[in-house]
């Protein structure tokens, strides 16, 4: 039951962070492009790479810490459902170029940020 609590706690923190970060970033840029979701997903991609390389592979942290940080915190911080809906909305609104930039950018940059996080975690 302790692992479930760790996931729930991390998820609550990650979801609150996602809400706040998305809102701040979206308001800062003030554009219709879904930059808030892109930002939190890229931050999450970076940290999942970092956490796996450093905490899991190097430090071998216990399952509760992994559940709290990776499944909970990063699972709550990142959002596939919002990404999917925003992508669909761009298509529905006829914003084909924005749709392509958003979907390709999220996927390509997400993998790249995961790679960067992993490399940083390995180097520590």
UniProtKB/Swiss-Prot annotation:
Protein localization: Cell inner membrane
Annotated catalysed reactions: fluoride(in) = fluoride(out)
Superkingdom of the organism of origin: Bacteria
Alphabetical keyword list: Cell inner membrane, Cell membrane, Ion channel, Ion transport, Membrane, Metal-binding, Sodium, Transmembrane, Transmembrane helix, Transport
TM regions (residue ranges): 1-21, 35-55, 68-88, 99-119
Annotated membrane topology: Multi-pass membrane protein
Sites where the protein binds Na(+): 75, 78
Regulation acting on activity, per entry: Na(+) is not transported, but it plays an essential structural role and its presence is essential for fluoride channel function.
Chief location bin: membrane
GO BP annotations listed: cellular detoxification of fluoride; fluoride transmembrane transport
Molecular functions (GO terms): fluoride channel activity; fluoride transmembrane transporter activity; metal ion binding
Keyword Nucleotide-binding (UniProt): no
Family listed: Belongs to the fluoride channel Fluc/FEX (TC 1.A.43) family.
Name of protein: Fluoride-specific ion channel FluC
Gene source species: Aquifex aeolicus (strain VF5)
Name of the gene encoding the protein in the UniProt record: fluC
């Amino acid at each position: 039951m302790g692992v479930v609590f760790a996931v729930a706690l991390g998820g609550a923190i990650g979801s609150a962070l996602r809400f706040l970060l998305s809102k701040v970033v979206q308001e800062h840029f003030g554009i219709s492009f879904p930059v808030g979701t892109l930002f939190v997903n890229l931050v999450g991609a970076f940290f999942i790479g970092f956490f796996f390389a450093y905490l899991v592979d190097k430090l071998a942290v216990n399952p509760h810490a992994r559940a709290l940080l990776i499944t909970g915190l990063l699972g709550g911080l990142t959002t596939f459902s919002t990404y999917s809906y925003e992508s669909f909305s761009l298509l529905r609104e006829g914003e084909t170029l924005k749709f392509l930039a958003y979907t390709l950018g999220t996927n390509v940059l997400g993998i790249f940020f995961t790679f960067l996080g992993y490399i940083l975690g390995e180097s520590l």
